[in-house]
């Protein structure tokens, strides 16, 4: 196999495709199957996980077994795909799956598992939370689920993956939760009984010492919990899953936690840093036990005090300056101990009710004299590569300060002069102390340092305030400019642009632009109106009928086109009627995408166009 495309794009498959086998690619996966393979609808399927370090070898060994058995399988073909599958923000119910194998029957499943357990013994990979682990010393997992894509609408009319209930042949959701779920009516084969029983067992650990444990947040790296001891003392438990929760440097949660433990031990006694109280392992997950600090994040503090910021900017600035004073002192103390914080942003700064500041989450810290390698970051607070680790911390502190006063500072990524404008406004609105504090921090990193999100294409800041008219003109010009990046002459509005008509609807497409133009007195382009008419006529019956995400919104937009466009208004009536018909079969009742929005759109179209028939149908739908 050719291996190229850079490190992340490197092909992980080192085995040649056998004669008589087919390859299919889609959704980030590469599938290999015998030419005569006849897939089942559902059954027990095998998942294999891997770390980036052993992925090539794990895939090669698994491929040889699958070819020997003549069994179909799919895999993530690149290191980038594998890293994403095990990343910190990946859905926990699906994370970690590197290879999926589709046995022909349970007999083959048992033989396959036995062989894989042997050839993959000692290989490493994250635990797949949705699955049974076949043996403890190999990354081989099993889950009952769909082999072929079958979908059914959920309570919000969103299509979800499904399987057939073997008891009554009805479609039921194919649950992919971060826990083992055996569908009703499915028997666990005898050779999977030990794995199933092991999944139901608990182990004695430090966790048993706490009278209550409440989750505060979850990620694929592990959870963060509030835990109370019998004497009433409260701790925070930070969980780390081995080989899971990869960051931009391919470090797993456990590797980052080991760094954080080292940092916290070095920072014992530093005021303003969350203190370490212990470390323990429960089952295969490792926990840091740290002090519980009541309070809110710096970002939340800012939101909670917006009323004060608007009503009394002087008092707001006094409190903000006091918070920043503490933040500066804490960062200086961390640097004196030889560490750079790393992932410094408002979410990792805690403010207590009395204004005391505490810094949290040092898993991305590094030695001040080591090369800077960003791992997990909130990018608008992250300096570009020109900054060293210490300078990057001060760059982030400056952005934390500016966030307290002007949260839209992030525009600096495309307009460097906007930062200067914000600094000037800090002095003008919040006083000398706030401005000098910011300027002092800015002096601690290089003049040319920019955010990592900075664009090569930059725009200036208007020398005077925009009028409403000039602002609207600028927006319209920018919207028109963006058309070059949209499909079929539409406007880019949704990152995937996958669903039918998504680039034509109100929320994410052309209808939203045309509707806004009409309501401010700008005549939309004939080409856009004609495109919406075409969309209305060709809208697939199975697609969303909703006001903001579907056909009803297109109809509403067409109804407001200049009355001289009778063709558009006729199409609006027809589209609103079809949206009503489609909505009857939907479960959702909300305004955005449900029956309420469709009915209101139909009423508005009927009123605007003067169509009594549509009005009667809309009223009848409302009464239902």
Named regions from a protein language model:
Residues 335-346, 351:
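Catalytic-loop of the protein kinase fold
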Residues 284-297:
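Conserved short submotifs of the Hanks-type protein kinase catalytic core
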Residues 262-272:
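Structural motif at the C-terminus of the N-lobe alphaC helix and the adjacent alphaC-beta4 loop
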Residues 364-432:
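C-lobe/activation-segment region of protein kinase-like
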Residues 275-286:
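Short beta-strand micro-motifs within the conserved protein kinase catalytic domain, predominantly
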């Amino acid at each position: 196999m050719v291996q190229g495309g850079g490190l992340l794009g490197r092909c992980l498959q080192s085995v040649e495709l056998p004669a008589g086998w087919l390859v299919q690619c889609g959704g980030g996966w590469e599938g290999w199957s015998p030419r005569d393979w006849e897939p089942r609808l559902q059954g027990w399927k095998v998942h294999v996980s891997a770390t980036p370090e052993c992925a090539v070898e794990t895939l090669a060994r698994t491929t040889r077994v699958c070819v020997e058995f003549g069994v179909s399988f799919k895999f993530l073909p690149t290191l980038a795909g594998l890293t994403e599958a095990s990343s910190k923000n990946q859905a926990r119910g699906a994370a970690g799956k590197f290879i999926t194998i589709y046995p022909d029957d349970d007999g083959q499943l048992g033989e396959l598992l036995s062989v894989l357990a042997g050839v993959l013994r000692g290989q490493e990979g994250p635990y797949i939370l949705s699955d049974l682990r076949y043996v403890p010393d190999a990354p081989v997992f099993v889950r009952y689920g769909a082999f072929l894509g079958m979908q059914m609408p959920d309570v919000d009319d969103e299509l979800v993956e499904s399987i057939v209930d073997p008891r009554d042949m009805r479609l039921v959701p194919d649950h992919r939760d971060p826990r083992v779920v055996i569908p009703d009516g499915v028997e666990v084969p005898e050779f999977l009984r030990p794995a199933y029983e092991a999944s139901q067992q608990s182990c004695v650990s430090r966790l048993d010492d706490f009278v209550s444990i409440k989750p505060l947040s979850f990620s694929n790296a592990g959870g963060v919990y509030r835990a109370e001891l019998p004497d009433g003392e409260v701790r925070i438990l930070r969980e780390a899953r081995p080989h899971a929760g990869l960051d931009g440097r391919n470090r797993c949660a456990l590797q980052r936690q080991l760094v954080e433990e080292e940092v916290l031990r070095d920072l014992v006694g530093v005021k303003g840093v969350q203190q370490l109280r212990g470390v323990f392992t429960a089952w295969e997950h490792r926990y840091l036990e740290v002090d519980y600090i009541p309070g809110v994040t710096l970002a939340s503090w800012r939101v909670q005090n917006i009323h004060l910021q608007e009503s009394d900017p002087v008092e707001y600035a006094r409190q903000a300056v006091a918070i920043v004073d503490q933040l500066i002192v804490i960062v200086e103390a961390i640097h004196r101990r030889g560490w750079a914080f790393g992932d410094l942003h408002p979410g990792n700064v805690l403010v207590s009710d009395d204004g005391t500041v505490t810094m949290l989450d040092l898993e991305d810290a590094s030695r001040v004299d080591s090369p800077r390698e960003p791992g997990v970051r909130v990018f608008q607070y992250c300096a570009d590569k020109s900054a060293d680790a210490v300078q990057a911390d001060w760059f982030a502190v400056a952005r934390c300060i500016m966030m307290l006063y002007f949260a839209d500072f992030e525009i600096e990524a495309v307009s460097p002069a906007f930062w200067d404008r914000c600094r000037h406004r800090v002095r003008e609105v919040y006083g000398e102390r706030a401005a000098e504090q910011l300027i002092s921090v800015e002096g601690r990193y290089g003049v040319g340092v920019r955010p990592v999100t900075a664009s090569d294409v930059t725009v200036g800041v208007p020398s005077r305030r925009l009028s409403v008219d000039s602002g609207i003109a600028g927006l319209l010009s920018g919207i028109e400019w963006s058309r070059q990046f949209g499909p079929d002459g539409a406007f880019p509005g949704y990152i995937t642009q996958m669903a039918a008509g998504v680039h034509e609807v109100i929320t994410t497409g052309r209808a939203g632009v045309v509707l806004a133009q009409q309501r401010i007195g700008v005549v939309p382009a004939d080409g856009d109106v004609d495109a919406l008419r075409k969309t209305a006529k060709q809208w697939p019956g199975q697609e969303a009928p909703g006001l903001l995400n579907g056909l009803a919104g297109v109809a509403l937009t067409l109804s407001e086109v200049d009355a001289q466009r009778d063709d558009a208004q006729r199409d609006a009536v027809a589209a609103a009627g079809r949206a009503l018909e489609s909505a009857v079969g939907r479960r959702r009742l909300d305004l955005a995408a449900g029956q309420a929005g469709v009915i209101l759109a139909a009423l508005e179209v009927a009123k605007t166009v003067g169509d009594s028939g549509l009005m009667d149908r809309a009223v009848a739908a409302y009464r239902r």
